[in-house]
Curated annotation (Swiss-Prot):
Protein name per its UniProtKB record: Small ribosomal subunit protein uS2
Family: Belongs to the universal ribosomal protein uS2 family.
Keyword Membrane: no
GO biological process: translation
PANTHER family reported in the protein's UniProt record: 30S RIBOSOMAL PROTEIN S2 PROKARYOTIC AND ORGANELLAR, SMALL RIBOSOMAL SUBUNIT PROTEIN US2M
GO MF annotation list: structural constituent of ribosome
Matches recorded under Gene3D superfamilies: Glucose-6-phosphate isomerase like protein, domain 1 (3.40.50.10490), Helix hairpin bin (1.10.287.610)
Record bears the keyword Ribosomal protein: yes
Amino acid sequence: MAQVNMRDLLKAGAHFGHQTRYWNPKMSKYIFGARNKIHIINLEHTLPALNDALAVIEKMVASNNKILFVGTKRAASKIVKEEARRAGQPFVNHRWLGGMLTNFKTIRVSIKRLRELEAMHEDGTFEKLTKKEVLMATREQDKLERSVGGIKDMGGLPDALFVVDVDHERIAINEANKLGIPVIGVVDTNSNPDGVDYVIPGNDDSIRAIQIYAQAVADVCVRAKDNSASEFVEVTETNENEAAAE
């Protein structure tokens, strides 16, 4: 996908906020006005905020840092999973487990158990179990896959969070804040921007708008990784050539 422009955001309805009676006054500086009792987000703020966030993410990924994609509500869940996977980044797209960051040691236990079940499934151990045991093990594996499957390869705490709907994911943001992990978040007119280091003012309910944000983040992650890989190849080739010359 090419760089996001104003037309993309307009077509996706990124400028449509919530009903005026549900607004959060802390978002007033990002609001252009109201139409039919719906707040209109000023995309003149959204586009540069998105680009600033993308620049930060690209720089972090180029340094081999991990960006945790978080979007657990129905409109965001599938998109977050698909784009995070494409980006090669961890994700949480079902319920956020309390302590997922602040009590990561406990989460590691769940990840270890998931890996054990995956290994059992692959090495034929399931075939030696009774039907009831297979059913119970499969259910456990499915449950763990939903809750920690997206972070099983994270290896440790993430370096930043990319969040869709900051009110819905407030527990995740609070945990990140406690640990000093920067938060990049899509913030709608009814939401509280507190605790979000990089605010992207925009509609967080429209599937098309969520797709644009997540796709843009994934794109810069992929680009940063590709650039890092090509730089590594160039350095390696240069070193080999210098060694051959000697």
